[in-house]
Each structure stands twice: as C-alpha cells, then as structure tokens.
Amino acid sequence: MTASLHIILDTDPGIDDAAAIAAALFAPELDLQLITTVAGNVSVEKTTRNALQLLHFWDADVPLAQGAATPLLRPLRDAAYVHGESGMEGYDFVDHQRQPLAKPAFIAIRDVLMNAPEPMTLVAIGPLTNIALLLMHYPECACNIRRLVLMGGSAGRGNFTPNAEFNIAVDPEAAAHVFRSGIEIVMCGLDVTNQAMLSPDFLSKLPALNRTGKMLHSLFNHYRSGSMRTGVRMHDLCAIAWLVRPELFTLQSCFVAVETQGQYTAGTTVVDIEGRLGQPANAQVALALDVDGFRQWVAEVFACAP
C-alpha cells in the first residue's frame, strides 16, 4: 500500500507516545515527515532524548525538532509519576549520535507546512504549546493545515484534576488558543482513550511479535496507566488510529472551550454536546470507540514494525 497521508507528529514521549510513534512510522497508510517534541510527560530535554532514542532504535530517517520547554504562561507540571523519571523507564536503549534540528519546533513545522504541495495533517499527542506558538507567530500557516488530530481533553472526568485531562491542563492557554484558531480539529479525549485498553492477553503476546514488541512490552511493564495484570491504556495511540481507521470512532461536532481561569477547573475542556451555549462547532469530538477493532488494528500495525 502506498502511503497517502503526510503527517507531522508533535509528542512528549512518554511510554504510550512510544507506541504512537511506532504506529506513525509503520502504518503503511501514513508518511511521517517530521517529529517535534514538547515538555509534558517529562522535560523537553528528556522527551527529545526519548524521541531520538526511538528513531535510532528503528533506524528511522525522520527529522526531529525540539520544542517548547515550558507552557506559555505556567510552570511545567509533568507526569513522571506515570512514565518514570526518564519518561521511558523499562528499556535500555543503546547510545547514538543523533541530534535535533537546529531550529525550534514551531519553525520546523512552519517550514514543512509551507513547502508541502498540499495541506498537511498535524497530530498532537502532548500539550499544545508548539501548535499554539505556530499559530501565534505564523497565523498564515492555518491555511496549510488540513486538520489537527489531538489526544487531549474530555467531555466528562479528568485524569489530572477532577475535570481536566493532562495534556490540556499542562498548558490550557495554548489549548484555548488552538481551539479558537478556526483550524479543523478532531479531539480524541479521555472519553475514548480510557476505552483503548490493551488486555493482559494482548500484552503477553508482544515479546514474540518482533523487537518492537519486546521493547514496548518492557516499557509497558513500567507504565502506570494500568498494569500488565489488568491492561494498559493507549491514550496517544488513539490519535494515530483515527487517521487510519476513523470508522472505529463515533464523533460528534461540538463547540469546545478551554477553561483557563478557574481555581478548580483550569484546563477543563467544556464540550457542549447538547448545543446549550449556542456557539458554532469548532471540533469533532470522539465519544465512543470500537475496542475490539482498535485492538485488532494495533496488532496489525505493531506487526508491521521490525
């Protein structure tokens, strides 16, 4: 199959990010043209190191640019308690000499977008700081973005605060700017990603699959979003799955606003499912997932990796 969808991936690896990067690299329908890193799960220095380690592991020739070290207006609150101090605890990657591009992520994204023959798809599976910086500094780039597919937000409960999902809560000002920008957005939030559970039986078969399966199995052993006994949630992988298998998701067009001021609600995505606010929809929000179909696709795409 010839790859038909050219994508840019903005990420903060992160254990489930590693699985998403594998899918972005090896799903035959996708052509990954740039990876950018952002502070989120751990510091941007660590997310950059982790992404470079993964590219070296797979001998993948994809450029990488380091992005924002802090949210727009707030100090970074990371998720090392979920992913480990390094962000990818559990596997000993070999040393390498790879380096990021000598320009910040938002400029690297701009350069790829402006030189592309047609609008491209952005995929963001970390805080939206880099995407907001792109749209703030180069608003003309919006015309070159086919759509933004993001992992973040929730129409209900949060996983970082009672109401807020981690990626949005880390930099709510950036998320608010992106949702107000007018670009087409597909939001894969906790409503679907909490359903995207890889079962213990699925996980037990990974080491026999290939060296990627062995590596991911080692990482998942240290991933605190679930356990090897009960299953692990593949939050970030949902954004990649939607690109390739959108029929697995039930979407609804909604108006989404991001709360930036509330003492208890900052970072909350206000998803107006019933249209009570009278605002035009600015996102397609994923609300349900075909879990069996998702697991089947994950098995297929992991099998495509070395």
UniProtKB/Swiss-Prot annotation:
GO BP, one annotated term: purine nucleoside catabolic process
Active-site residues from the entry: 235
GO cellular component: cytosol
Record SUPFAM superfamilies: Nucleoside hydrolase
EC number assigned by the record: 3.2.-.-
Coiled coil region boundaries: none
GO molecular function: purine nucleosidase activity
InterPro entries the UniProt entry points to: Inosine/uridine_hydrolase_dom, IUNH, Nucleosid_hydro_RihC_nonspecif, Ribo_hydro-like
Record key words, sorted: Glycosidase, Hydrolase
Top-level EC class as recorded in UniProt: hydrolase
Family: Belongs to the IUNH family. RihC subfamily.
Alphabetized HAMAP family for the sequence: Nucleosid_hydro_RihC (MF_01432)
Functional summary from the UniProt entry: Hydrolyzes both purine and pyrimidine ribonucleosides with a broad-substrate specificity.
Protein name: Non-specific ribonucleoside hydrolase RihC
Origin species: Salmonella agona (strain SL483)
Lineage: Bacteria, Pseudomonadati, Pseudomonadota, Gammaproteobacteria, Enterobacterales
